[in-house]
């Protein structure tokens, strides 16, 4: 595999070290994701997949090991540099949408762009295009409370892609939806990912959805293996 967008080498992570309730979550994890590759991370609840995603996305730091994004080592970077990389290069999606309730769908997509220095006009144009791409352009002026669960998650997808990241990290992105809605929303996500050429690491316990991705890996007992 050449030109990885993400490379993790020997990642370990423990909590409460030295205490009676100490737990090791990740044990020497190695992972490479190529540009444009979509990888399914299959793991049961509590296996450490959220921790792995947070370390990959610079929201947390490993105890040992290296994280490289496009070949750049993340350890030792200033907080400002890590934040800049996280904002520009990484998009996050969670099981719950975390949309700002006081803003409408379009505004939830516009705001992260403004924080990244994009003009309001350009941000509004991109928001409209993303909402159209996931089939809910007509819902742009609606606040999250007026949207269905599937619509809320589609807006969350658009927000994650607002700043045109190079890599998408998703933690059970359809886990809070019923099966029928889950399939439709996942289709919308995959279409966005494929159309933009994104690399993606998507955690899911849904084996049918995992099978639709380029590759599957399993996290168990703190270690990764191919499925």
Swiss-Prot record:
Gene Ontology terms for molecular function: ATP binding; ATP hydrolysis activity; transmembrane transporter activity
One family name in Pfam for this protein: ABC_tran
Keywords assigned by UniProt, alphabetized: ATP-binding, Cell inner membrane, Cell membrane, Membrane, Nucleotide-binding, Translocase, Transport
SUPFAM superfamilies in UniProt: P-loop containing nucleoside triphosphate hydrolases (SSF52540)
Subcellular location as annotated: Cell inner membrane
Predominant localisation class: membrane
One GO cellular component term: plasma membrane
Domain ABC transporter residue range list: 6-227
The enzyme's E.C. designation: 7.6.2.-
Binding sites annotated in the UniProt record for ATP: 43-50
SMART domains in alphabetical order: AAA
Stored PROSITE patterns: ABC_TRANSPORTER_1 (PS00211), ABC_TRANSPORTER_2 (PS50893), LOLD (PS51244)
Protein topology in the membrane: Peripheral membrane protein
A biological process term (GO) from this entry: protein localization to outer membrane
Family stated for the protein in its record: Belongs to the ABC transporter superfamily. Lipoprotein translocase (TC 3.A.1.125) family.
Function, in words: Part of the ABC transporter complex LolCDE involved in the translocation of mature outer membrane-directed lipoproteins, from the inner membrane to the periplasmic chaperone, LolA. Responsible for the formation of the LolA-lipoprotein complex in an ATP-dependent manner.
Assembly behavior: The complex is composed of two ATP-binding proteins (LolD) and two transmembrane proteins (LolC and LolE).
Protein name: Lipoprotein-releasing system ATP-binding protein LolD
């Amino acid at each position: 595999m050449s030109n990885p967008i993400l490379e993790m080498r020997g990642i370990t992570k423990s909590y409460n070290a030295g205490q009676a309730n100490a737990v090791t979550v990740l044990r020497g994890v190695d992972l490479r994701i190529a540009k444009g590759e979509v990888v399914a991370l299959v793991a049961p609840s509590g296996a450490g997949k959220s921790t792995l995603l947070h370390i990959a996305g610079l929201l947390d730091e490993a105890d040992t090991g290296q994280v490289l994004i496009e070949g750049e080592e993340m350890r030792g970077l200033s907080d400002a540099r890590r934040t800049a990389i996280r904002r520009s290069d990484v998009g996050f999606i969670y099981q719950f949408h975390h949309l700002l309730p006081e803003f409408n769908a379009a505004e939830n997509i516009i705001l992260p762009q403004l924080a990244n220095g994009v003009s309001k006009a350009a941000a509004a144009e991109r928001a409209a295009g993303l909402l159209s791409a996931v089939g809910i352009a007509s819902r742009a002026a609606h606040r999250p409370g007026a949207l269905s669960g599937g619509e809320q998650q589609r807006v969350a997808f658009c927000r994650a892609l607002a700043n045109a990241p190079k890599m998408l990290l998703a933690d059970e992105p359809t886990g809070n939806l019923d099966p029928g809605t889950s399939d439709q929303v996942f289709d919308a996500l995959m279409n966005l990912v494929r159309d933009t050429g994104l690399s993606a690491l998507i955690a899911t316990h849904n084996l049918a959805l995992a099978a639709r991705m380029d590759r599957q890996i399993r996290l168990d007992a703190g270690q990764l293996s191919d499925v």
